């Protein structure tokens, strides 16, 4: 009796465990399934999906049209949009009747990028009724670089359905995640300034140590070439005077002075005619 009871308990536990695992698997949220066999996806695409991970928990909406032709587009990055049962990454909802159309699904995701943009494509949407050879819909989301926002400005751009095949819905969105990493580098002026400051520091410290340890100087005399720096102002003034002046400083006078001994006695009658009569 005991072996049978033990087997029955073990079987019940295994059954409950299987049900729990199944429920957990069903409730687990779907994510992007890149094109290609499992484990053989492009490493570049996997890196781009990881790069967009901060957007996984965000949902984006945009409303277009008017009246009975008003549609709401709901988009999520590598997460289910809409009713969470169709595996859709982007859906279209007719506002007048609430009909939901899957534009693209997560299980057919393709992603690539350029210098300042990322292109996310969801394929496998609901089939067209009369357009594009009744092929499945496809969503193309162009994520452009905008360093001032994590994600914003999700808007539909156009729907290309005038072709026999390869039709698509085009959307755009801004995100800082699409921007290339900023490469910080010093300008030429900064490099020269750093170099000059380094040379000055080496000169002052090295000269100070030399004056103190080798020469045995004390106080202000430890500063290297102290006499030169004290007289620098005069040297600069002399140099400016030499460069800027066009004539020598001591120019001989163009006239010669007359001494008192060379002056004759003036006649007192010279101005008599100016006196009033």
UniProtKB/Swiss-Prot annotation:
Domain MRH positions: 30-181
N-terminal signal peptide: 1-26
A single GO cellular-component term on record: transport vesicle
Sequence positions bearing Phosphoserine: 267
Places the protein is found: Lysosome membrane
Glycosylation (residues): 57, 83, 94, 107, 113
Region (Disordered) residue spans: 256-277
Disulfide bond residue pairs: 32-78, 132-167, 145-179
Keywords recorded for this protein, A-Z: Disulfide bond, Glycoprotein, Lysosome, Membrane, Phosphoprotein, Receptor, Signal, Transmembrane, Transmembrane helix, Transport
Domain statement: The extracellular domain is homologous to the repeating units (of approximately 147 AA) of the cation-independent mannose 6-phosphate receptor.
Role played: Transport of phosphorylated lysosomal enzymes from the Golgi complex and the cell surface to lysosomes. Lysosomal enzymes bearing phosphomannosyl residues bind specifically to mannose-6-phosphate receptors in the Golgi apparatus and the resulting receptor-ligand complex is transported to an acidic prelyosomal compartment where the low pH mediates the dissociation of the complex.
Subunit architecture: Homodimer. Binds GGA1, GGA2 and GGA3.
Record protein name field: Cation-dependent mannose-6-phosphate receptor
Organism: Homo sapiens
Gene assigned in the entry: M6PR
């Amino acid at each position: 009796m005991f072996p049978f009871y033990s087997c029955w308990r073990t079987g019940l536990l295994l059954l409950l465990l299987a049900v729990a695992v199944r429920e957990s698997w069903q409730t687990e949220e779907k994510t992007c399934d890149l094109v290609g066999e499992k484990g053989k996806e492009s490493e570049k695409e996997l890196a781009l999906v990881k790069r967009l991970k901060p957007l996984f928990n965000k949902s984006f909406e945009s409303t277009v049209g008017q009246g009975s032709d008003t549609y709401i587009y709901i988009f999520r990055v590598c997460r289910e949009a809409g009713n969470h049962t169709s595996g859709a990454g982007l859906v279209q909802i007719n506002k007048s009747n609430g009909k939901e159309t899957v534009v693209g699904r997560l299980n057919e995701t393709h992603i690539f990028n350029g210098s300042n943009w990322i292109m996310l494509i969801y394929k496998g949407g609901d089939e067209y009724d009369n357009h594009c050879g009744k092929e499945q819909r496809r969503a193309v989301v162009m994520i452009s670089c905008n360093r001032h926002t994590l994600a914003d400005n999700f808007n539909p751009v156009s729907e290309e359905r005038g072709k026999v095949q390869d039709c698509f819905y085009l959307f755009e969105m801004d995100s800082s995640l699409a921007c290339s990493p900023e490469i910080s580098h010093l300008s030429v002026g900064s490099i020269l300034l750093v170099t000059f400051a380094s040379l000055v520091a080496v000169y002052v410290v090295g000269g100070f140590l030399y004056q103190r340890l080798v020469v045995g100087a004390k106080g202000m005399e430890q500063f290297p070439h102290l006499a030169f720096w004290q007289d620098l102002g005069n040297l600069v003034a002399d140099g400016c005077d030499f460069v800027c002046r066009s004539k020598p400083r001591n120019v001989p006078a163009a006239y010669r002075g007359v001494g008192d001994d060379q002056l004759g006695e003036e006649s007192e009658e010279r101005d008599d005619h100016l006196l009033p009569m």
